[in-house]
Amino acid sequence: NKGVVSRVLPVEYMPFLPNGRPLDIVLNPLGVPSRMNIGQVLEIHLSLAAKVLGFNISTPVFDGADENDIMDTLDMANAYANHPFDDEELAAQKAEAEKNGEEYPEDMVTFTAQYKDVLNKEVFDYLSEHRDHRAEWKGVPIGRDGKVRLRDGRTGEYFDSPVTIGFMHYLKLHHLVDDKIHARSTGPYSLVTQQPLGGKAQFGGQRFGEMEVWALEAYGAAYTLQE
């Protein structure tokens, strides 16, 4: 959706993921329900999974991923980022935890055990070859709902509720205040109605509607209207 930039913060004050990575832009969720452009919500969920897994996803309009596909892909992304990839990695993580005197979860399942038989061989081989890419997402628990608990960059505290995160194509709408700002005192009038012209290009006046007129009349200041 289009919107205005209401606040620009230094990167260290931006909300950040559990592994310390800051967000670039935060959008108000009220921009979604009334406009009913729900595609962007599905897009942001799928983009998160695609980014974590490190590949592009093609999803044609009438033959694309449905909600369950997206949730399954998010599950897979979470397993890829946060579970050991194979038995070798599992053993290494267990040894590391023991060395540090930490408890390692007994029920930890490797990514290979979960997904090797489910995925195409090419996809699985690709994920296996590019597993270094997981470091960016390690320590970010990704739920089936695509939400993550963020911390406030200013206080370090967690926000009350989990927040939907992801990647969107976001374009700059070229309407800038510097080009729009305008004011006038006296200026050109319409020949026919003798009212001030409208718009910045004509050096026009601001429209003063019925209700604004009533506000002045209520204060007994109707003559202010002459200009």
Where do the PLM segments sit?
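Long insertion/accessory domains within large nucleic-acid-processing enzymes
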Residues: N1-E227
